[in-house]
């Protein structure tokens, strides 16, 4: 496994791989890797000849007062996890190279970025789509793998790739959870022991909603109340949103069906966590 920091070296490596007839898979990350990231890498390893993991805490997707400066970083540990997952190259560019002096070009997906996290984190998705577009141009992957925990992000990136005629295949992978149900996230490291216990309200709320749906409940109003009651019972929890959307269009629905996305964003103490499920999926 090789660590590459230079954009030019990563591009030339990708060009050489493609010219040799090899397929390239990319797993974009912000580092502080966990088993969720490893599952993406494992899948990429199966599907491609060359596996690249990018590690870049992208400043343009953090807003004022967010956690860019405190976001957890541990490159040495990340290298061990990536190597164990069969990564060939870690691409870890410097922010000053990705956004040099005079940089002024951004990629913006319009409608899909307005609800959910886009409403509470203005500018976030513009930063995400810009950095992902840049990574696609640098790494030139045949496929790129993203986790479904960031469901809106996955939907937005798919839209960007389609709208801009990018040839990269976007692969969405299932959420990886801790043994007690908490969705794996680098931000879980912020949680105190008590907050960590409180954070289970997200997955418990989703389980309750899914159970009621499978028992025949279709009213979004009733299903939302189930989720709200569970989350509001936790002392540390402050709800950002509990929403029911069509999974493909991210438009609100009043009656739930198999393609309804249940999306949650909840602050546990100072830590903002997200989780989701699609009601028709296991």
From Swiss-Prot:
**Which superkingdom?**
Bacteria
Q: Does the keyword ATP-binding apply?
A: yes
Q: Which principal EC class is assigned to this enzyme? A: ligase
**Record's GO cellular component, any one?**
cytosol
Residues noted as binding ATP in the record, renumbered to the chain: 30-37, 147-150, 176, 184-187
Subcellular location field: Cytoplasm
Identify the main location. Answer: cytoplasm
Its BP terms in the Gene Ontology are: pantothenate biosynthetic process
The UniProt entry, under PANTHER family, shows:
CYTIDYLATE KINASE/PANTOATE-BETA-ALANINE LIGASE (PTHR21299), PANTOATE--BETA-ALANINE LIGASE (PTHR21299:SF1)
- Tell me the subunit arrangement: Homodimer.
Q: What's the miscellaneous note?
A: The reaction proceeds by a bi uni uni bi ping pong mechanism.
Q: Which NCBIfam families match?
A: panC
The protein depicted here goes by the name Pantothenate synthetase
Q: Which organism is it from?
A: Geotalea uraniireducens (strain Rf4) (Geobacter uraniireducens)
Report which gene this protein is encoded by. Answer: panC
């Amino acid at each position: 496994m090789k660590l590459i920091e230079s954009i030019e070296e990563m591009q030339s490596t990708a060009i050489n791989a493609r010219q040799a007839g090899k397929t390239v898979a990319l797993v974009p990350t912000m580092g502080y890797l966990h088993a969720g990231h490893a599952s993406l890498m494992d899948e990429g390893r199966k599907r491609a000849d060359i596996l690249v993991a990018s590690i870049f805490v992208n400043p343009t997707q953090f807003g004022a007062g967010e956690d860019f400066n405190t976001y957890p970083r541990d490159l040495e540990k990340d290298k061990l996890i990536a190597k164990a997952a069969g990564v060939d190259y870690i691409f870890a560019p410097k922010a000053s190279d990705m956004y040099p002096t005079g940089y002024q070009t951004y990629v913006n997906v319009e409608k899909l970025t307005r609800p959910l996290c886009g409403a509470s984190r203005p500018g976030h998705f513009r930063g995400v789509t810009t950095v992902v577009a840049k990574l696609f141009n640098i790494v030139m992957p045949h496929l790129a793998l993203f986790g479904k925990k960031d469901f809106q992000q996955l939907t937005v990136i798919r839209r960007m790739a389609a709208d801009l005629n990018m040839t990269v295949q976007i692969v969405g992978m299932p959420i990886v959870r801790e043994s007690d149900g908490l969705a794996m996230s680098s931000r879980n490291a912020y949680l105190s022991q008590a907050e960590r216990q409180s954070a289970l309200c997200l997955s418990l709320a989703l389980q309750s909603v899914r159970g009621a749906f499978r028992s025949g409940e279709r009213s979004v109003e009733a299903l939302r109340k189930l989720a709200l009651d569970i989350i509001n019972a936790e002392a540390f929890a402050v709800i950002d949103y509990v929403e029911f959307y069509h999974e493909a269009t991210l438009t609100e629905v009043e009656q739930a069906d198999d393609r309804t996305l249940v999306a949650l964003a909840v602050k546990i103490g100072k830590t903002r966590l997200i989780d989701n499920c699609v009601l028709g999926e296991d």
